């Protein structure tokens, strides 16, 4: 089973942090993971309070906000009947969960949804060419860690192709993206270092409860909205945690 975004903390032969691609990477080496999916539902740990084994970490549930992102997109662009989701096929657990939630939300909202795949810069470029051909009126970008590193590229492409897009982290909005809903980066990543430090001091991952990101923020870029010809409803702007002008 591939993990959405884990960190493996290895104490021998010397401390180092690497990115494992599967839970089977080790059953003894302490692993600190970070992921957007529910670690219990995907079988990563038996419970939040008692993770057991050699695993602990942080769950931000950003993958489970995919439907909320589509709802936000629909609220901003109610005339768009064709929309798309962009997921990373190399993270199948995350991609499948987001695809399932987006499809359910699209049915509820009466939208036609196309799910596109990308895991390289070139594939992202190709995806936007496809979006243009599909005449998609909006895009929800998946909560995969790879897309975090491509926030600027994604924001530039959404403006170039004039496609309203919603993502998980504020960095996308600060780079020119239209909006974001998700856990804050600080709330998500800071505990990872804390866990690593505690494990280095001798504590066992099995005894460290999995933490859940507690703060979800909504950001909107009003400058981008204006460039895309979108009028942000006052109730929506009032709900936003931050407006970029």
What kind of feature is each model-predicted range?
Residues 1-245:
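Short hydrophobic alpha-helices and adjacent helix-cap/hinge residues
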């Amino acid at each position: 089973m591939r993990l959405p975004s884990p960190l493996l903390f290895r104490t021998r032969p010397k401390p180092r942090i690497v990115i494992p691609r599967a839970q089977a990477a080790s059953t003894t080496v302490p692993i600190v993971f970070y992921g957007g999916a529910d670690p219990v539902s995907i079988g990563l740990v038996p419970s939040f309070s008692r993770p057991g084994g050699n695993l602990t970490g942080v769950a931000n549930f950003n993958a489970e906000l995919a439907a909320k992102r589509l709802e936000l997109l629909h609220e901003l662009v109610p005339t768009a009947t064709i929309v798309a989701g962009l997921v990373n096929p190399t993270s199948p657990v995350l991609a499948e969960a987001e695809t399932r939630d987006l499809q359910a939300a699209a049915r509820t909202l009466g939208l036609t949804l196309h799910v596109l795949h990308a895991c390289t810069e070139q594939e992202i470029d190709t995806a936007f060419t496809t979006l243009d051909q599909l005449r998609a009126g909006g895009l929800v970008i998946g909560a995969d860690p790879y897309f975090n590193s491509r926030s600027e590229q994604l924001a530039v492409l959404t403006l170039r192709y004039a496609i309203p897009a919603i993502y998980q982290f504020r960095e996308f909005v600060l780079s020119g993206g239209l909006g974001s809903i998700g856990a804050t980066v600080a709330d998500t990543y800071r505990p990872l270092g804390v866990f690593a430090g505690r494990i280095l001091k001798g504590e066992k991952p099995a005894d460290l409860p999995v933490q859940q990101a507690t703060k979800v923020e909504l950001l909107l870029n009003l400058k981008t909205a204006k460039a895309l010809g979108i009028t942000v409803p006052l109730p929506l702007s009032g709900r936003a945690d931050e407006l970029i002008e």
